[in-house]
């Protein structure tokens, strides 16, 4: 009995400390995305936010008017869904959020500089919409 309790306690401790055990898979926003490369790691463009945006859930990022955002992928719009791009904020004043990649509405930003064309169409996967 003691060994069973000890095993359960260890399992709970390691399970709670493991960051992979705390995530959740959210609904897909699209089935395809456009990227600059096959792995979607290269920056497509730099955009500036034209309006503030409060993220409705963990798939999205908060953006402030005037903020610069690096774009890594562009979801292919489907039927009545919105058009969303994935990126991360840029700038020293936003260093707490730098590196966090999330979606934001394309309609709220203007492209400042295009680094590479997004000409690779890639299927989205569940991990594209995973939240920690």
Swiss-Prot record:
Keywords from the UniProt entry: Disulfide bond, Secreted, SH3 domain, Signal
GO biological process, one term: cartilage condensation
Domain SH3: residue ranges: 42-114
UniProt subcellular location: Secreted
Disulphide bonds in the chain: 35-40, 58-131
Region forming the signal peptide: 1-23
Assigned protein family: Belongs to the MIA/OTOR family.
Protein name: Otoraplin
Origin species: Gallus gallus (Chicken)
